[in-house]
């Protein structure tokens, strides 16, 4: 952790050096050393780690620089000078733009995926609670429907056939409970009020 600060500073420094050198310089010389645990030449100091080496080398490659005389043996115990060849400015610009484009595409895909996941979890079915109708108006409507479609329904006592059932009552039709939707009111005679703000129509 103690080497993170110097490492970050050195990385930014060399990125600037490499980009500036790509403006027109054919080659840039960077001082590298050979780590004790690896034979890979790497820029750094006495506190340089293998991770620092790989990170700096990756930045060099992304910026379009390649090492000259890669197979030249390095001397141990001293800081060796290694030459890097800079690619033309257009190639550096092109590689940077392609990298940025890839990052933007990946970011956009991840953003769309996260938004879709959040919306799917937050989506709730819209429940509409119908307004509770006036029982007297409903009874009058059912009476008018019955008189219209069943004009010869019977005697005067049949007027009581259209009535409001108390909450909790059940109506049996042909030996079993018969419940239909309120939209089927034309074919019904009995209205059940369950007491929850909605009405259930039942055939008699």
UniProtKB/Swiss-Prot annotation:
Q: Where in the cell is it found?
A: Membrane
Its principal location?
membrane
Q: How does the entry describe its membrane topology?
A: Multi-pass membrane protein
- Which keywords fit this entry according to its UniProt record? Membrane, Transmembrane, Transmembrane helix
Residues crossing the lipid bilayer are 4-22, 90-106
| GO-annotated cellular components | membrane
Domain of life of the organism encoding this protein: Viruses
Q: What name has this protein been given in UniProt?
A: Putative membrane protein ORF19
């Amino acid at each position: 952790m103690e080497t993170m600060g110097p490492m970050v500073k050195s990385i930014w420094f060399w990125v600037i050096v490499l980009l500036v050198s790509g403006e027109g310089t054919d080659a840039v010389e960077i001082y590298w050393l050979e780590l004790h645990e690896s034979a890979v030449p790497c820029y750094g100091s006495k506190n340089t780690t293998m991770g620092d080496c790989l990170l700096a080398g990756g930045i060099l490659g992304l910026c379009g620089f390649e090492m000259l005389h890669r197979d030249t043996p390095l001397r141990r115990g001293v800081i060796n000078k290694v030459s890097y060849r800079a690619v033309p400015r257009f190639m550096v610009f092109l590689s940077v733009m392609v990298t940025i484009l890839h990052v933007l595409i990946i970011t956009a895909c991840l953003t769309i995926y996260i938004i879709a996941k959040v919306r799917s979890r937050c989506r709730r079915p819209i429940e509409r609670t119908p307004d509770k109708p006036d029982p007297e108006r409903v009874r009058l409507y059912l009476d008018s429907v019955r008189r219209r479609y069943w004009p010869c329904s019977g005697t005067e006592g049949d007027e009581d056939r259209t009535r409001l059932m108390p909450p909790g009552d059940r109506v049996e039709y042909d030996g079993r409970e018969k419940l239909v939707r309120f939209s089927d009111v034309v074919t019904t005679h009995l209205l059940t009020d369950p007491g929850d703000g909605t009405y259930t129509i039942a055939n008699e």
